[in-house]
Amino acid sequence: MTLNVNVLTIFPEMFPGPLSYSVIGRALNKGIWNLNVIDIRSFAKDKHKTVDDKPYGGGPGMIMKADVIGSAIDEVLSKNKNTKLIYMSPSGVKLNQDISGQLTHFSNITVLCGRFEGIDKRILDFYDFHEISIGDYILSGGEVACMVLIEACVRLIPGVVNNTQSICDESFTLNNQLEYPQYTRPAKWRGLEVPDILLSGNHKKINLWKANQSYCITKQRRPELTDTINGDIYE
């Protein structure tokens, strides 16, 4: 199933940007996923193509207008009535591997990128938007966050990453833990050596070492992820 992604933005020239490179870009060229970028400004009715205005009640900055954004959303819905609506927002649910995986099951998603001080709340009240955040910090707009979301989803689609084992072994996928350390040639570099176990050829012991390292790193750096794991098998 092809994933079709619609992006609503006032800066359409930002796309595909980084999404045109590496495995994500190759998947785009192969049609494994499609990108449709919609310029919100093109739906403004005045000669200046105004997309923002001062907030009611006062306050700093400008707010993106509901009538303009609504027209852009209606255009998308007229062609894809079942599209999954997503708004990139610091108030949203924090993006994780599970959410990325769930979104790949949709054939069509639409991502709204805000700017300025945000969008008129009535957009979220009128439409069925799912708000997603990529972290507890603020960006100047939703476009970069949107790219993070798209890449996190697309790389999970079968056929995008050639070695599917890479996805199975990486952080947050295997038992919801952080990934174990990785090494490659040379075996010795500036006085630092690759752990002997990785050079032993004993795959049973190597796999146990990887599991142990993954658990220990997760316990140290993200202890909340290990709450449901029986650590006795790793220690």
Swiss-Prot record:
Specifically methylates guanosine-37 in various tRNAs. S-adenosyl-L-methionine binds at residues 114, 134-139. Keywords: Cytoplasm, Methyltransferase, S-adenosyl-L-methionine, Transferase, tRNA processing. InterPro entries: Alpha/beta_knot_MTases, tRNA_m1G_MeTrfase_C_sf, tRNA_m1G_MeTrfase_TrmD, tRNA_m1G_MTases_N, tRNA_MeTrfase_TRMD/TRM10. The lineage of its organism: Bacteria, Pseudomonadati, Pseudomonadota, Alphaproteobacteria, Rickettsiales. Pfam families: tRNA_m1G_MT. It comes from Ehrlichia canis (strain Jake). Homodimer. GO terms for biological process: tRNA N1-guanine methylation. The keyword tRNA processing applies. Its EC number is 2.1.1.228. The keyword S-adenosyl-L-methionine applies. This is tRNA (guanine-N(1)-)-methyltransferase.
